[in-house]
Every structure is written in C-alpha cells, then in structure tokens.
Amino acid sequence: MSERKLFTSESVSEGHPDKIADQISDAILDAILAEDPEAHVAAETVVYTGSVHVFGEISTSAYVDINRVVRDTIAEIGYTNAEYGFSANSVGVHPSLVEQSTDIAQGVNEALEAREGQKDDLNLIGAGDQGLMFGFAIDETPELMPLPISLSHKLVKKLADLRKSGDITYLRPDAKSQVTVEYDDNDQPVRVDTVVISTQHDPEVSQETIRHDVIEKVIKEVIPTSFIDDNTKYFINPTGRFVIGGPQGDSGLTGRKIIVDTYGGYSRHGGGAFSGKDATKVDRSASYAARYIAKNIVAAGLAKKAEVQLAYAIGVAQPVSVRIDTFGTSTVSETDIEKAVRQLFDLRPAGIIKMLDLKRPIYKQTAAYGHMGRTDIDLPWEKLDKVEALKQLIG
C-alpha cells in the first residue's frame, strides 16, 4: 500500500488585519515611488479597532498625503461601514515617519565595492541589510507554484471577488483559507483532502447558507473536480460564527504573513518581510530575484523543482553566497546550473533593480494573495525570458 503524504498551506484575504497593514505599507511605498523613484522607504503599519499607526524610516524628495493614502486603501479593501468597527471615513490615522539612518544610508548609497575603487555603476548600491533570501519553483501548477498555496490564494480571492461584485451580499472583508493536498509516492498531488474556509459575514445570515454558498460558488469554482472526491472534507466557518472580524477582532501588523506571501511553507524562508520596503532592501528584491531564477530553471526543464538561496552583507553589493538546490530532480548538475545563474543574472542590488525594473510603483498589488506565482497581474519576476539563455549556457 502506498504511503499517504499530506501537505497544508493557508492564505488570507485582503481584509485580514495583517494584510490591511501590508497593503497600507505598500500603498505608501507606491505613492512615494510614483514621485521619487530613488526614494528609500521602510514603512510599517499597525491596525486595530478604529485606528491606524504608520511608522518607519523614509528618505525622499516626494510629498505624500499619508492620511489620504491610508483611507483610500481601506476603502478599496471594503471597510466602508462603521458597523465593522473599522471604516475608511472614521478611522484615526497616526503617521510617525522619520528619515533613514545616515549610518545605513552611507552603505546603501555607496557600496563597499565602490568605496574600494571598483568603478561600476551597479556597484553603487550596497545591500540595505544582511540576510538570506529564498526563491522557489515547482512544476505542480502552470504558474510553477506548490498546489496547496496556489489553491489557498485562489479561494480567498474568489471570496473577495464575489463580495465586491455583490454576488454574495452578506460577505464582509475578513477571510482565511487552508488547503490540505494529498501526494503520492512520486510527490505528485493526487487529491485535495481538506478545505478550511472562515469568512466574515453579516449577523443575520445562517451558517447553512454560508456553507452552501462557499462550497458551490467558491470551492467548486476554484478547485478542479479531478482533485475532489467523496472523502474531501470541508470545514466552513468551523467556530459557528464570524461577524466580528478585521481589525475589530484582531490587531494587524505589516510583515506577519511572510509564509502566505511566498510558498505556503513548501520552501524555506529567510525571515524577512516584503511590504513597505523599497528595492534596495534585499529582503524584498533578492527574494523576487530568487523566484525569477528558480522559475526559469524549472521552466527550462533543468529541474522539476528548484530552490535558490541568496545571502548578503549590509553595504556590500555582491551576494556573499548563491546556492541552488533541486532536491534530486535536476537533469544536469547543480554546479552547472549555479555557474549559469551567476553568469546570466546580476545579483547585486542595483543589478536586480535594473533587471526587474523595481523602481516603479508596482507593489500594492502584491500585498494580498501572494507575491509569487500571480497570474492575474503582470510581475517582472514571473517572466520566463531567461529560459533559452539558461538552456544555451548549460548545453
């Protein structure tokens, strides 16, 4: 009898408190970059009942109306009703932003290599901090993402679409999903074992109605029928009631959903969050570059799955390490893949920014439903434009 292996990932909706915070931080980043592409931004947000606090470090020539950006973002998410305990019109907004530390700025604005006389424009920017970052890709889905996180994202995105379109009128913005996938002996996904969905709702609707609508209009519309069978388990609002939600139910903070933002736990994570950070922060830009590399490796047929680790020292342009792990699935040696990667991808912060055009205001759209594997928006790190070059270099 074959061994039954299960893997579970979760996602949360744009109305989840932590995701509200992420979206506000990235909306502020985008507003600044739209006026000043050279800005350095580290914007953190805390949300709770009736209040938003924005704090962090920013160096920019731009003027941004933080109050307006915060309120517009909250309204777009759907918190426009005072009954929710958190509303765009009535929430208190408390910004506390200061200039970036000069000690940090001197290493970011002029990398160690430039200070030592290595005259190259791409040596001008040093990494904004030390750290390690991971990127991952796997051939389980067309977007080369693990199936559990892919389905989890699509479920909460479908809930939001139905709420915003008015197709399900009783839904409120906060929601969570969790999908457990069963794998066979060859590590191929064969079925969905369990689906958990908790969705905020108006007080008068019955749980029977919610269960019916979520199964019929969300789950069955998102998960392919080939993965569903009579033994698939559904837990819909298993507490029995979810009226109080969003920041009224729980406080939210930027950077607390880093596993949701990436691969749902299927790959390793370096620990750094993304939202509110400009591209000189390698927590963000190098994670995108690592995904870009991993996705092109898998798309080129060099491996069935690939994990890329990058690591940096603060104020230094060149990464201190590059590691490729294909978990025994590669068709060529990992050493050859790593050599090709080093030759093809400039992994200095300025090189990544140039390669992926990261000075643009493109970040708010990534702050809910995942930064990786998105098929609904155009993201530069999801491009497959290095596939042929990788094949040619490796032969």
UniProtKB/Swiss-Prot annotation:
Region spans: Flexible loop: 100-110
Cofactor names: Mg(2+); K(+)
Positions contributing to Mg(2+) binding: D18
Cofactor details (free text): Binds 2 divalent ions per subunit. Binds 1 potassium ion per subunit.
Gene3D superfamilies tied to this protein: 3.30.300.10
GO function terms (MF aspect): ATP binding; magnesium ion binding; methionine adenosyltransferase activity
Pfam families in UniProt: S-AdoMet_synt_C, S-AdoMet_synt_M, S-AdoMet_synt_N
Catalytic activity: L-methionine + ATP + H2O = S-adenosyl-L-methionine + phosphate + diphosphate
Metabolic or biological pathway: Amino-acid biosynthesis; S-adenosyl-L-methionine biosynthesis; S-adenosyl-L-methionine from L-methionine: step 1/1
Keyword tRNA processing included in the entry's annotation: no
Identification of the protein by name: S-adenosylmethionine synthase
Gene encoding the protein: metK
